[in-house]
Amino acid sequence: MTNVVVVGSQWGDEGKGKIVDWLSERADIVVRFQGGHNAGHTLVIDGVSYKLSLLPSGVVRPGKLAVIGNGVVIDPHALIAEIDKLGKQGVQITPDNLRIADNATLILSLHRELDGFREDAASNSGTKIGTTRRGIGPAYEDKVGRRAIRVMDLADLDTLPAKVDRLLTHHNALRRGLGEAEISHQAIMDELSSVAARVLPFMDTVWLLLDKERRKGARILFEGAQGTLLDIDHGTYPFVTSSNTVAGQAAAGSGMGPGALGYILGITKAYTTRVGEGPFPTELHDEVGQFLGERGHEFGTVTGRKRRCGWFDAALVRQSVAANGITGIALTKLDVLDGLDELKICVGYTLDGQEIDHLPASQAQQASVKPVYITLEGWKESTVGARSWADLPAQAIKYVRQVEELIGAPVALLSTSPERDDTILVTDPFED
């Protein structure tokens, strides 16, 4: 038995929600360790759809403990809204099934506003990153700048005013520079007071909780958000998110030592998608790209934005395997490729006439690389609902084997539809 870390190996939207839900039945605890409510997923359980952006997937399953770690930035208003929405769907969230790290950073209204101000200014200058305008980046900035308001601060009214002063000294200077009205100290105090009673009952010392549960033999599932190529360090900077999304962050963002993380499962789509700005070497602007988007229903859960689509990029996923120490992958949306006459896989790039086997860190070079493809025969048969290798066409199996060889990691799970049971289990990560 081992713990399992789930990470996206591409630009997010790889189908982590279904796989995490599938694994959560085997877990005792499900932990979010980075990001905020800027990435969402939909779970379908007994015909009911649950849309989650901040809460760990475990909250919708009875008997599971969901944990939000210190690496997450928490918008208390979004948290309360998500809890209330689930309550109306019959899922009651209490301290018995949800705990929040006392040292997690809060996203406030001023963070959301600053995010929007900056994106508007960047749009005018052609330097837009394409954020969700939800305040994620500004909240992480305050965390690193040591001026953030954290969950525990809601319980300490004696020291809170001084912390708000420090926060506003920074933010009001920015707002003046942007030509925006300053925010009063009382407005922030009122905002914090309005959410404290709803948030504090869930507060806990998460690192200690997880350590105790680990020693008792609990199975812990760490649920990543976004994807490796959106990592602040290892992604396509600056078109990235504001946190580390790689597996190592599961330790830093929860307080669990890295030696206890266990199996690293990389969720990997059978083709490639990306939302928003940034380089995308295998992007398709033709009818195949349109086919993938329509067949794969490639629209964002949180923003509704249309995703850009392209061929599978083995060079990029190979980098993700290395950066995360991926043990095995869950290959998703294989069924979307049904019916294509031929399939291409990117195995590397050319840059200035030279062949390279990885995506450079340089923004200019990332924009200049050209993909090098191999071509495989497609398949006409349907893979939808396949639950064993015997259900798959021979060419589909060849495609999967080629992916494994090129990325240097085995397929542990294979998903053939959005339905959670339409999954081929090769290796149970909890038993590996």
Swiss-Prot record:
Gene3D superfamilies assigned to the protein according to its UniProt record, in alphabetical order: Adenylosuccinate Synthetase, subunit A, domain 1, Adenylosuccinate Synthetase, subunit A, domain 2, Adenylosuccinate Synthetase, subunit A, domain 3
Reaction equations catalysed: IMP + L-aspartate + GTP = N(6)-(1,2-dicarboxyethyl)-AMP + GDP + phosphate + 2 H(+)
Cofactor: Mg(2+)
GO biological process: 'de novo' AMP biosynthetic process; IMP metabolic process
UniProt KW keywords: Cytoplasm, GTP-binding, Ligase, Magnesium, Metal-binding, Nucleotide-binding, Purine biosynthesis
Residues that hold substrate according to the record: 301-307
Catalytic residue list: 13 (proton acceptor), 41 (proton donor)
Annotated binding of Mg(2+), by residue: 13, 40
Compartments reported by the entry: Cytoplasm
Keyword Nuclease in record: no
Bilayer-spanning residue ranges: none
Cysteine disulfide partners in this protein: none
Record note on cofactor: Binds 1 Mg(2+) ion per subunit.
Binding site for GTP: 12-18, 40-42, 307, 333-335, 415-417
Record-stated family: Belongs to the adenylosuccinate synthetase family.
Role noted for this protein: Plays an important role in the de novo pathway of purine nucleotide biosynthesis. Catalyzes the first committed step in the biosynthesis of AMP from IMP.
Name of the protein in its database record: Adenylosuccinate synthetase
Gene that this polypeptide is encoded by: purA
